[in-house]
C-alpha cells in the first residue's frame, strides 16, 4: 500500500485545526453526610442560595444553608440512594418551573412534572419559583369581583380580583369545599370569549392524602372546571422540601396569567402544613428555633408568598392574581402563631366553625368574625344594594339570640328580629357543588331582606327559594338578564322584582 507523507500531514493538520476544546466544565462537590432528607456537601464554593444541585443518582436538591466549609442541601426525593463521598454537581440555575396555558387541565408535582399520566407538558416558558412581589407603583386597588357563587361570601365577605382572603377553620368544616365551589363557579365566565373576564384557577395541595387530591381532581372534572384549572400536588408522602416548595410553584404558574394581562385565582391548601414542613427542614438544617419551634423567618415564608397576589394597573397589563390561602386551626384557636401571622398578612378572612357545620349551616361561615377588608370596593352594585342590611340584621339576630335563651316573654320587635334572622340564616345555606349565579343571589337576598320570607316556615325557606328562582327564570328572565348585564339594581328593576315576588307569593303556599 502506498503511503504518501504529504497526505498524512494534511490529515493531521486538519485534525489539529478542528480540534474541539469544549470540555464539560461543572463544579462538583462531595457529600460529607446525609440523613433525614438533608445532605451536607463540601466543595461547592460558588453555589447560590436556592440553586438546584444534582446528585450522582439523578435526584435533585436545593442549596439552602451556605456555610463557611459546607453547604446544607435539602433533597427533592429519597435520600436512600445517596451516600457519603458521592459527587454532587451544580446546575447553575435557581429552582424554576414550566408555566403557561399548556398546564391547564393538568396535575403536576412541586417541580412542575406531570403526575396525571397524560404525557409530557408542552410549555415554552419557565419561571423561577421565588420572585419578588410587584412594587407599589405597578399595583392598583381592587375593583373587580371574584364571584364565588356562595351567597354568604358574595353578599357578606366579598372577594375582589387581586385580594388575599384567608379561609380559616378547624378540620372538616368545609374549607376546601368553599375553594372548589369558587373554581366551579368560574365555568360561565371561562366559556366566554372575553379574556379580561376569564378567571383561571390554580389549586395547590400541600401535605394532603393522595386519595383526597384524586377526589378533588375528580370533582373538578365532573363539574367541567378542570379545563381551566391547574392542580399542584405535594402530598403527605412526599419529602418536606417539596411540600415547602409547592405553594411557590403554584404561585409562579399563577403569576404567568397576572403578568400577561389575564386573571387567576390560587388556593393554597393549606399553609399550616407548609409551615410544618418548613419547620422540619429548618430544624434539620440546624437553624435556631423560635416560638412553637418554628424558625424566625416563618412570617416571611408566608408574607413573600402572599404579597405576590396583586391587581396590576393598566400600564402593566391590568392582570390580577387572587390568593385564597387556607389555614387549619386546632379547636378553633385563631390566636396560635401561624393563624395570627396569616390573618395579619391577608386582606380579610372567612371563618368556618365546627358548631355551625354540625347545626347544618353550610357553608359554616361565622358571619360575625368573617371580614373582607378590600372586597367591598369590588362588589357589584346590585349585590351591594341588596346586601347592605343583611349583615346588620344577622349581627343583631346573633346578639338577640344569645339573650332570648333566658327570657320567654319577648316584645314584638325582638320576636320579629329573631324570626327574620332565623330565616336569613336558612337562606344563606347552600349545598356543595351548586354555586349560584350572582343575579339569582341578588334576587334571593332581596326577597330575604324585604320580608318575603318572614311568613314562610323556617324549614320551607330552601323550598321557597328554589321555587322562586325557577319562577323568575321561566316568567321573568328579563329581570335576571338586566341584573346580569348591567351589574346594577336600579329602581325600575327593583319595582319589577317586587311585582314578580308579589305574584310568586300568591302561588307559593
Curated annotation (Swiss-Prot):
Q: EC?
A: 7.1.2.2
Query: What protein name does the entry list?
Result: ATP synthase subunit alpha
The free-text function statement in the UniProt record for this protein reads:
Produces ATP from ADP in the presence of a proton gradient across the membrane. The alpha chain is a regulatory subunit.
The protein's matches in Gene3D superfamilies, at most eight in alphabetical order, are given as: 2.40.30.20, ATP synthase alpha/beta chain, C-terminal domain, P-loop containing nucleotide triphosphate hydrolases
List of residues binding ATP: 169-176
Q: Name one GO molecular function term.
A: ATP binding
Superkingdom of the source species: Bacteria
Q: Which is an annotated Pfam family here?
A: ATP-synt_ab_N
InterPro entries, from UniProt? Answer: ATP_synth_asu-like_sf, ATP_synth_asu_C, ATP_synth_asu_C_sf, ATP_synth_F1_a_nt-bd_dom, ATP_synth_F1_asu, ATPase_a/bsu_AS, ATPase_F1/V1/A1_a/bsu_N, ATPase_F1/V1/A1_a/bsu_N_sf
Please state where this protein is localized.
Cell inner membrane
> Belongs to which family?
Belongs to the ATPase alpha/beta chains family.
Q: Which CDD domains match?
A: ATP-synt_F1_alpha_C, ATP-synt_F1_alpha_N, F1-ATPase_alpha_CD
Its Gene Ontology cellular component terms are: plasma membrane; proton-transporting ATP synthase complex
For the site labelled Required for activity, the residues are 370
Q: How does it sit in the membrane?
A: Peripheral membrane protein
